[in-house]
Amino acid sequence: LHNIIETSGGAVVCEEMCTGTRYFENLVDESKTTLDEQFMALSERYMKTNCACFTPNTGRIDDLLRMVKEYKIDGVIDCSLKFCCLYDTEKYSVSRALKEAGTPVLSLETDYADTDAEQLRTRIGAFIEMLND
């Protein structure tokens, strides 16, 4: 997906996917000394993750709006994995919040198969062209 965006004239300045920046946010507190404290610190770190599985999840929308401002984002590509019902459920709320904030949004769904590549390239290219107008 990043390659398609960048070869279509866009720039990925930030991302909020499951395996992306979330992995590095809210690191585990390593100052705990007992096993119980360490397990609690690990649990707290996982529970701070703003994932669609914690619906309703206003924290995720707040994070997205913060990132749009912080990284001066022109438009958001909201991509979800096909058949990930949790992200599909949240897609409407995310799109509405971003549009209300004046940020253009392109919602995509893919299974990351090679057969999706050209359709994604067409939609992403049109979105980037719209942002540049």
List each model region and its residues.
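A short, acidic, amphipathic alpha-helical segment used as a generic capping/interface helix at domain edges
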Residues: 55-72, 89-90
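Peripheral docking tails and interdomain loops at the edges
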Residues: 92-133
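Acidic-and-aromatic substrate-binding clefts and catalytic sites of carbohydrate-active enzymes
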Residues: 54-56, 84-88, 113-117
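Redox- and metal-dependent alpha/beta enzyme cores, enriched for Fe-S-associated oxidoreductases
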Residues: 1-56, 60-63
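Acidic beta-strand-to-loop metal/phosphate-binding motif
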Residues: 73-82
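Glycan-processing catalytic domains of CAZymes
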Residues: 31, 46-47, 75, 110, ...
